[in-house]
Amino acid sequence: MSGMKRRYDYEEEDGYRDFRPRYSKRQRLPPVVQLCKDMLPDIRTIGESVKAFEEDIKFLSEAIINEFGNDEYFNNALLSTFNALILEQPHKQPAIALLTIVVNSGNPAAGKSVINYFYEKLQHLLDMTVVDDFEVTSNETGPWNKIKLTLRFLSLLSPVITLTELTNVYQRLFELAVQLNRSSDANTRNPLSEAIYTNTLLNIPYLFFFNKEDETLRTNVEDLIQYAESNYEVKTVDLSLTKEYNKNLPYEPVQWVQIVLSNVKNALANDMEELKNLFPDYQNLLPTSIEQQMFNDPLTIPEFEKLLPFSGLDKGLGSVDSMWKTPRTAFQVYLPNVVGDFSTVVPITTYTGMLFDDIIVDIVESLEFNRHEVARQVVTLDLYFKPGIFTEPGLSIAQLLVQHNEMPELSTYKIEDLAIENILGLIFKLPTVTQSFAYFYTLLVEICQNSPKAIAPVFGRAFRLFYNNLDNMDHELKMRYLDWFSIQMSNFNFSWKWNEWEQDSIAFSKSFYNPKITFAKNLIRKELRLTSNRPDVEDSLTPEFKQYLDASYISKDQLASYYQSFFEGFSFDPEVIKDNDLLFKNEVFPFHEKVQLILDYIHKQPLEKNISELESLLEDIKSAHGDKIPDFNRFTVTLLIQALVYSGNRSLSHANKYISDAKSDLVTILEKMEVPPEVKEQWIIEAVIRYWNCNSQNGFLIVDSFKHSELVTAKSILTFSLTDLNGQNLGLVDATSIESTFRTLTELALQQASDISVFEFVFERLLEIINDTVSQLGTNEEIVAPSVDNETMLDVDELARLDLIWKYESAVGFIKSILRKYSDEYSVLLDKFSAGLEQAVPHEPTRKQLDQWFNEIREL
């Protein structure tokens, strides 16, 4: 706001008379509207200029002191702006609180109005916690998260609010947390209890922001902490289902509820040394005389009995509230002592680190509607805290190493690392994400575009951590990592240092199930799908990785065998098989002219079609060439399906049109075949995927269209994906197939009456794969892939055995993901699964793992 005109007087001068002729002109805004239009943007950006902060507080407070109470429009606009900042940009709360304290000294009625407004907001939010039809929008963080933020703001106002009233709110929230915690047995956590306990403790240091020397406040806070410590029993619940890594975790998971008390106590210890190094000192801006205010009415906490049904936080109350449904853990990417003998992010085991994580998550979640603002705010968070917490923005790791060696007393914490780590934590959150992946991915792209030199290396270090831990990473998270990596690369010219991974490719390129090889293959294929200019991807690869440029779902030899399997006594040159083309219309086939007539028929308008014409064409082919086509039913289905797909290959909507138009004819022809429905459906799916062999993502999406037209079932799609082909199971490793499986199950889960038998089928099919793999390995011991040095030369037998172990881990990891992701559906099947587990799974270590997951499902 520095340098702006500071006058907010829009009233015309007394006695001014204008005798000029009147001309038509744009209507002037009312003075109060113009005032708001000029002043509120300055409030929204308060603190963004450190140099202008003191001047901003002075002029804004003067304007509010003079204007508040004169017009309802101004009052409402100001309070709404305050509320938006407090909930959406909590790092600006101290600035708004300071503004309020200064205003209170010059206009106590205005100060009282602000306090009452937020106290009433607090009461309203508490009332909303027991409302069944609570309305949730995409940026709704939840009533309990908003209670946290509203109480934090009121805590900042401790100099102007009667302390007993303020600390009484804390006491009552702690009592509620304790009561909820005691409502369940010693081994069962209460999600809401943990949220209230953690959030309330996290707010306590804000009571001292402007009020560090108040002895009464210190005594009251000591009593509060003593009560929480003595009465709240922290319950340790370890859910392996929601762990990001299946084994060899790169860091020890830390739950927020386990560390918040010690973090707060340490922050208040040693005469609040940590807080003095964290919070900026605004004492010189505080007014000399302060008038204290009281709340209008006692706070009403919802009755325990009414609140208990909502305490699982599983009723869709908001994005941040829902994060407490399962134990809230700290996600770590930039681990200490990796790049040097220091850390680049503030440890979560400090109050400072925990608070920064909390604020960044709140900004990302509550400002979801304004991605550009989020991208700007999360990397400038350091401006609102004490200088020196973070190192200079954009400092490279090499520069940081030099600085640390020369001046070890300087901070090594990077605000970029902290922001990116928290956003990645939201992307990799299990069991569910809080926003669409598109929002998180594009947010990261924008942050990088705003400052590529500073952010690109931060991304690179995250890429490397995830890649190095692919062997251990959760199955579903591998897919999220793949998506994020591919989107980042496609937005930055597909640039990556592929040479870093070359040794892995040299060592394991012959493996089918090695996690790093499957990742590289899927990544390159995904990049090819994301660009219309193939050379962009090709040119970015080193020679070692160009072997993975073939994006085919199955090999050319397998595809040729598929087409040749339709004929006996007739063969063709495999070279005639072309991508995205209808093979059977090629002139090498004696019936190609009839195929062209079938295509002509498909292109006719629905009212012009007569199925007898189509049947006649098929009969002509059978009469003339049936002796060379042993299974004419299979051939007919494949020909018609591929002809449809070929006709609609310009776009998915185009394909949908042709499928819809041809549905009646297809049903008529299929019904006349004396073949089991599931066999015909496999023919349909295989025909589509083989046609789109060069782009199986398109193939699976078009298969979905056949499903929506009720020509194939969800179970048939899953059967196809999870069936071995020549001893290999693409459904475990190919990204497009895995995406199809998750998409199919998710669509089923969203239906009001989902078909549980399909979920049962997928589980049982994966068990079959596991049992078969264990049998081939011939072991009763626990199966864990050894850490294999990529410099080691493996013979054929060693690699084959390793591949079986990786296959086993892929299938077990897949089961872990579907049990977690579709826990509601699988919870119905738990008794059945448990009863038959010993017979269904001979391998005891696998059986124990599944039994553990069955028990954990009840916690999700």
Curated annotation (Swiss-Prot):
It comes from the Eukaryota. It holds the Pfam family MIF4G_like. GO terms for molecular function: mRNA binding; RNA cap binding. Gene3D superfamilies: 1.25.40.180. GO terms for cellular component: commitment complex; nuclear cap binding complex; nucleus. The keyword Iron does not apply. The keyword Transport applies. It is found in: Nucleus. Its main location: nucleus. Keywords: mRNA capping, mRNA processing, mRNA splicing, mRNA transport, Nucleus, Ribosome biogenesis, RNA-binding, rRNA processing, Transport. GO terms for biological process: 7-methylguanosine mRNA capping; mRNA 3'-end processing; mRNA export from nucleus; mRNA splicing, via spliceosome; mRNA transcription by RNA polymerase II; nuclear-transcribed mRNA catabolic process, nonsense-mediated decay; response to osmotic stress; rRNA processing. Residues 36-271 form the MIF4G domain. Component of the cap-binding complex (CBC) involved in the nuclear export of capped U snRNAs. The CBC complex is required for efficient pre-mRNA splicing through efficient commitment complex and spliceosome formation; and involved in rRNA processing at sites A0, A1 and A2. Component of the nuclear cap-binding complex (CBC). Belongs to the NCBP1 family. This is Nuclear cap-binding protein complex subunit 1. It comes from Eremothecium gossypii (strain ATCC 10895 / CBS 109.51 / FGSC 9923 / NRRL Y-1056).
